[in-house]
Regions:
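Membrane-interfacial alpha-helical segments at the cytosolic side of multi-pass membrane proteins
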Residues: 162-169, 242-260, 290-301
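Aromatic-anchored segments of alpha-helical transmembrane domains
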Residues: 39-47, 98-101, 187-195, 267-276
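Interfacial helix-loop-helix junctions of multi-pass membrane proteins
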Residues: 201, 236, 269-295
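N-terminal transmembrane-helix/juxtamembrane module of multi-pass inner/ER membrane proteins
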Residues: 3-6, 10-65, 85, 89-160
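Membrane-interfacial catalytic/cofactor-binding modules of polytopic membrane enzymes
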Residues: 192-257
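Transmembrane alpha-helix/helix-exit interface in multi-pass inner-membrane proteins
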Residues: 103-119, 186-212
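Membrane-interface loop-to-helix entry segments
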Residues: 145-160, 232-251, 286
Length: 317
């Protein structure tokens, strides 16, 4: 495919975005439907299964606060004239809500399936590989390699908004909406996966299997801080890290091609880092990549359906 054809394909997809459903003066786009729908879904889930969740009242209050914050951002965003402020308000609100929903999703993992499914993952990987990959990889651990893997794992937090800025300031608001919608939907699909097939993760399920410590420098310290202070048990399959990294990489390919090539070694290393560093099993990472690919493929059709619904609503009104 020629560069012109690739650009045209990206423009066609970006052109799907921008339709707004106005509710009480607030314009909702496709990404907003995903975020607000997820907030409502988790609130309903917590109400129904509150007996199986620790401190459900606190989670409901947090969801209410997040909802007010997000709706407030939707109210103020169109009134901003400065492009930088518009970017930070829009992107910051979506990405903050995704991060907060991840923390809430971790608390709801065992409400349907009541036990961790790590033994099933271990059995599958033993049958496929003959070894447990996360344990087998210990023979390759060195401080420099650990530091690089930790860099790839944590720099994702910078790429997340950074790529959004590149897309926005080079291509405009509609391509940014494509990026944000796909990120939001991928996150939510991963969160649902946590409940359908809850997996504790190798670090929590079998810590005794790891006899070689993960030593490195600054990024290793940063990564371990995230593991011990932000991550909780679970949140494993599909791997949100691999899923979101795939979305970022493919969106770079669609809108900012030089960034796609520049990110290649980082994203490929990130995939490996998730199980090399014992955050995930190899299976989690593969499922995360496949989840992102599926979401990317179906997103244009979903946005088209959103647009049709908005137009029907406008006609009926």
């Amino acid at each position: 495919m020629s560069r012109r054809s690739r650009d045209a394909a990206g423009d066609r997809i970006a052109g799907l975005y921008g339709e707004r459903l106005f509710v009480l003066g607030v314009g909702l786009q496709a990404a907003d439907a995903v975020i607000l729908g997820a907030l409502f879904f988790f609130a309903l889930l917590i109400l129904v299964f509150q007996g199986r969740i620790t401190a459900p009242g606190g989670l409901l209050l947090r969801l209410a606060g997040l909802s007010l914050f997000y709706i407030g951002s939707l109210y103020f965003h169109p009134r901003l004239k400065n492009r930088v402020l518009r970017f930070f308000v829009r992107t910051g609100a979506v990405q903050l809500l995704c991060a907060q929903l991840f923390l809430i999703a971790q608390r709801t993992q065992l409400i349907v399936v009541r036990s961790w499914q790590d033994p099933a993952v271990l059995k599958l990987e033993a049958a496929v590989f003959g070894v447990q990959p996360t344990v087998w990889l210990q023979k390759f651990i060195t401080p420099p390699l650990t530091e690089w893997m930790m860099f790839a794992y944590v720099i994702y937090l910078i790429i997340y908004p950074g790529l959004g800025a590149l897309i926005y300031f080079r291509k405009g608001e509609r391509p940014l909406e494509d990026y944000l919608f796909t990120l939001a939907l991928t996150n939510v699909v991963c969160f649902l996966g946590f409940m359908v097939f809850p997996v504790a993760g190798p670090f929590y399920h079998m810590p005794e299997a790891y006899t070689v410590p993960l030593k490195g420098g600054f990024f290793a310290v940063w990564g371990e801080y995230i593991r011990r202070n932000i991550h909780e048990i679970g949140g494993t399959i599909p791997s949100p890290h691999c899923a979101i990294a795939t979305v970022m990489w493919m969106m770079a390919h669609r809108y900012v091609r030089p960034a796609f090539y520049a990110l290649a070694p980082v994203i490929l290393s990130l995939y490996v880092s998730t199980f090399f560093l014992r955050y995930h099993y190899l299976t989690d990472s593969v499922v995360g990549v496949l989840t992102a690919i599926l979401v990317i493929l179906v997103s244009p059709a979903l946005v088209g359906a959103w647009n049709s619904a908005v137009r029907r609503k406008g006609t009926s009104a």
